[in-house]
Amino acid sequence: PIDTVGREYGENYDDFIRLLNERGELVIRPDRASAHRCAYLIRRTGEDRYELCEDKVCKARMSIYGNDYDQAYLLREYPDELPEGFEKNPCKRDHYDKKSLFELISTFKYGYVIAEPYKMSDAKPGILRIYIANEKLKETRLLDYYYTDLDGGAARCRAVTPSGELDGERIGCWDELINTVTDIAGYISEIEYFTASIIFTDDGFVIDSIDTNPDLPPVAHSDELNDYLMTRLHEKRETVVVTREKWWTAFKYKRFKRFVKHFCRPGIRPYMQKLWMSSVWDDLRHNKGTTLSQKLWCYKRGFLSFRIKQYGLTKDNYKDFLSDYQYHWLNRINNSYQIWINDKTTTRYVFEPYKQYLAKYYYDIIKMEGQTCIKALQDIPEGFDASFDGIFALLRQEKLLALKPSSGTHGDGFYRMEYADGKYLINGTEMTEDGIRQMIEGFKSIYVITEYLFMHKDLKKIYPYSVNTIRVAVVNRSAYEPKIMQTYMRIGSSSTGFTDNVGYGGICAKIDIPTGRYYCAEKIIDHKFTPCPVHPDTGVRIEGIVPNWELMKKGITDICRFMPELEYLGFDIAITDDGFKIIEINIHQDLHKVAEHSEEFKAFFRAKLALKAKQYELKKY
């Protein structure tokens, strides 16, 4: 009954209590499978009176896989000897009222999901696990089945036949179960190998969990599963060659990780430390606008030296700005749910309720088992199959398509696919079908083919050869009230080709958030923002009102409310004639004009810095 799009039921703690009072019982489950965290039933026992109870499904699951139950000791007495480092929960009670229940939930260190409880069938008190393989996006195979139940509290594993026979009897609803699992597997055919764990209830079954890195069955596994795994092992041995160069690269990375752990600021990711060091080295060699002493002064305080001109840095004001190293250190600001937007294919799946704000997704191109495989995505028109022939037929119909990395940023790896006058063009260069096929087969990462977006006619006048996107930085600290903190327009030029990256020679213009007025266009020359009021290629003055501005602001904030788990996002927006489209979402966007950040935006970063410093017990950060 809860609307995950409109949130009509409500989404704060009072609404949760109202739902709990209506239902009488809810389950609070870890947001991901864990051997050390369990689920609890929250049960209403009277007026403003609640208790935490054992979830039998969770107990069965953890007993089956040999883990202790309730390692937080919330449902049992503390033992005389607690595990090393264990801290007693000060909010533990036998019974809770509304306030004390909130205090208890607030002590949970990890993510949990409050859900409708389901009861395991007394006739089948166990878990069925199915091993599934998706081969080259085309075929779904169910490789093996085994059932684990509890007989007097002890786990007992038994094989299940492909026809659903267990101990000589066929499992009820088997055909429906297999059809459901097969349909789900086909829908997510990008996942090559996984298991689905099924729990039987009195009125059917539920899929309790999906594991993309499963252990082997505890019983003798089927010939089909064995053949599949041995085939994949043989393929990997043939395709993966450990050269001296690869070995040396892996050794250097391992050594670098040790260096970061022992000599760099606690909490920084090795990848971000490497980026920072590369940026410093590049700045040291190529920035001719600062002296060596100025460079060293900046590096010691966490800034790249060109920030002296950009921010007007001095020894008196440098602490007023978020430094480059601090921003590297903060990564990642978002939690693990950032996986929703780490790649465009996943984003399309997650954003189904808001698909009108995305480009139409036509094809996925993935390397699987050493071959280039193609999947038709949700928005593909009828009559186009998942093949190169289908891609070329769609291109001939649409005339323009976008080909881009599923997880790319900055416009890197973007290709403009065009069909005009009987010829195929890639980024303006004529190519044959065979040439395009060879180019795509050479891709090592996942690519997507989407509709080619056309910007609003008013913005097209400024520069027609790129989309001229709007960057919208949003902070959602409370999960309920997302706020747009910074907006600016990026405009392409002859230096950027079909993209509008400011760092590659593009132009940026400020946008007034309340009104949508864009003005004060600038471009970066020698690391310094330089006025550029007129576009150098078209001669058009860069000033006006962004079309569909209010519609865009509402759409973006609605989307942020839809995924309140993420609190810091950067949207790249294409304004179109009839609305807007999201090109990509950044989880740790590039810093832009920190000197012009609002006080509220600065306060957000200060709070994040203080929180991380507390986590790592740092006094200086």
Cite the ranges covered by each PLM segment.
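A short, surface-exposed helix-loop junction/capping segment
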Residues: 80-85, 156-169, 320-335, 529-542
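C-terminal active-site "lid" helix and adjoining low-complexity regulatory extension at the edge
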Residues: 161-193, 200-265, 269, 527-557, ...
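Short, flexible loop/turn elements at secondary-structure junctions
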Residues: 32, 117-119, 134, 198-202, ...
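Phosphate-binding site of ATP-dependent enzymes
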Residues: 24, 32, 37-46, 50-159, ...
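ATP-binding N-terminal substructure of ATP-dependent carboxylate-amine bond-forming enzymes
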Residues: 14-15, 238-349, 476-478
